[in-house]
């Protein structure tokens, strides 16, 4: 919003934590969580750097991927395609971070499950971010989404026990965002 030549940035506060609501704010935290180059045989994505996986980006030179290139991929393939700007501001950070971890459809399913646990009118858990989902998530709390995100991580470990080594880091990340 422009007022008398000044731009005002609204910062959303949750408790004593300043909520990040823009791509430029959120991406720095995501890149920090994702870390640098890793080639762990137990990682479903295979070779990764900054969270960009060779499995999903076979034409990208992962080892030599720059931060700026990773940011561009995240902005185009995750933020814009994930419609992050349409999600309520208080949920943008966790939603984008879940898109990185679970893909867009998986992230939306977590939001839909969280909404269904709160709202009387249930929505279909189909992974689509349409009008019904956007309406249903308007007033769900960040803590409710965190709880369903932790559940999703737990189910991954239950289904694939070799992923247990990632559990504690996933759990911490779920609570930090």
Put a short name on every predicted segment.
Residues 11-177:
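Cell-wall polysaccharide-cleaving catalytic domain and substrate-binding groove, primarily
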Residues 2-3, 7:
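Polybasic, lysine-rich low-complexity intrinsically disordered segments
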């Amino acid at each position: 919003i422009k007022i008398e030549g000044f731009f005002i940035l609204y910062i959303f506060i949750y408790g004593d934590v300043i909520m990040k609501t823009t791509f430029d704010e959120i991406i720095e935290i995501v890149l920090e969580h994702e870390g640098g180059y890793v080639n762990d045989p137990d990682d479903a994505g295979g070779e990764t750097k900054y969270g960009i996986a060779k499995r999903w980006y076979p034409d990208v030179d992962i080892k030599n991927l720059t931060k700026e290139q990773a940011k561009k991929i995240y902005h185009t393939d995750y933020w814009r395609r994930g419609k992050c700007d349409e999600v309520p501001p208080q949920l943008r950070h966790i939603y984008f971070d879940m898109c990185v971890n679970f893909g867009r459809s998986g992230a939306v399913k977590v939001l839909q499950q969280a909404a269904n646990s709160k709202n009387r009118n249930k929505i279909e858990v189909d992974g689509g971010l349409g009008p019904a989902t956007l309406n249903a998530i308007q007033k769900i709390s960040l803590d409710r989404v965190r709880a369903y995100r932790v559940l999703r991580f737990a189910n991954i470990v239950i289904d694939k026990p070799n992923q247990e080594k990632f559990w504690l880091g996933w759990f911490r990340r779920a609570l930090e965002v």
